[in-house]
Amino acid sequence: AGPIQWSVIHGDPETGVTTMLMAEGLDTGDMLLTLKTPIGEEETYGELHDRLMHIGAQALSQTVAGLADGTITPVKQDGRLATYAPMLDKKIAELDFTRPARELHNLIRGLSPWPVALTHLDGKLLKVHKAAVAEGYSGEPGTLLDSKRMIVACGEGALEFLTVQLEGAKRMDASVFLPGRRLEVGHRLG
């Protein structure tokens, strides 16, 4: 499962770490301590993962101290509020440009650094490691809207690809990638 990735993909505004007692079911034990943190609008799964690693260490330290001094009381979970993150499937990595730009931006962030969002350019696989929502653009979904910046139309709005990797090539900034490709406005991706 990929709970951190799904939080980013769904555009959740915050996430966190909870310590809990062990129980027979998966993540069903009584909760001990929860530390929440906002998810940045540009933050990737990898960046959030690394932040949560440190927050998790703090939570564990605070939990041990709280149990030792009696300031933490276990709280039963409400099973009706429980959510489970399904396993990630590489099939979700394919960018569907008929979807809104914000959704695709969240998908790209949630799949970076693995498994990485992708599309096709001239029959070759193009991985999209980083992107941003491009304001003030619209057009036929999947078409290039700017020949100097890699801005691609979506079902609602547009995305600017910032870091890409063409099949068989190294990862690079789109500003370095584009000049060697000579792509024209209207060029189709997907």
Tell where the protein language model's regions lie, with residue ranges.
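Short secondary-structure boundary/capping segments
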Residues: 9, 23, 84-87, 118, ...
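Donor/substrate-binding cores of folate-linked one-carbon enzymes
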Residues: 1-84
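Alpha-helix boundary/capping detector
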Residues: 34-35, 45-48, 57, 86, ...
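Short gly/pro-enriched beta-turn/loop segments at secondary-structure junctions
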Residues: 55, 60, 77-83, 88-92, ...
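An anion-binding loop in the catalytic cleft
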Residues: 92, 97-190
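Short clusters of hydrophobic/aromatic residues that line enzyme substrate/ligand-binding pockets
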Residues: 26, 31, 72, 84, ...
